[in-house]
Regions:
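Double-stranded beta-helix
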Residues: 67-119
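A generic structural signal for short, solvent-exposed coil/turn residues
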Residues: 4-9, 35, 44, 60, ...
Length: 119
């Protein structure tokens, strides 16, 4: 890890949404970049709708209240998310707020959905 110092300040994860699924509405101090690997949908950033599809990259600005939503009724959506969150944690700038929790029930017709095992 001596050669990977820059990676210590970047957090990366993959989100998978069932067809028609969506994540929680939330905000955090750190910015984020996400790359759409599969699917199509839109984000809401501070009330503004931003459509996206596979191959697109989006930036979530610092302190932006946002939500990711899949618009594909037939196929899952997969996004790669990258954040400088470890750096913000180190600086004690850890404010993160859930504005609206994700649904507890799956989207209609997606009761048996499971994220791909290959992720």
């Amino acid at each position: 890890p001596q050669a990977c110092k820059v990676a210590q300040s970047i957090e990366t994860h993959v989100d998978a949404f069932a067809p028609g699924g969506y994540g929680q509405k939330h905000g955090h101090m750190n910015s984020a970049v996400f790359f759409v690997l599969k699917g199509r949908g839109h984000d809401i950033h501070d009330g503004r709708k931003i459509p996206w599809e596979a191959g697109d990259a989006l930036i979530v600005e610092n302190a932006c209240v946002h939500q990711h939503l899949s618009d594909d009724p037939d196929d899952e959506t997969i996004v790669l998310i990258m954040k400088a969150k470890p750096l913000f944690l180190f600086m004690h700038m850890i404010f993160q707020k859930m504005v609206e929790f994700p649904p507890k029930e799956p989207a209609p017709g997606q009761e048996d959905y499971a994220p791909p095992a290959s992720l």
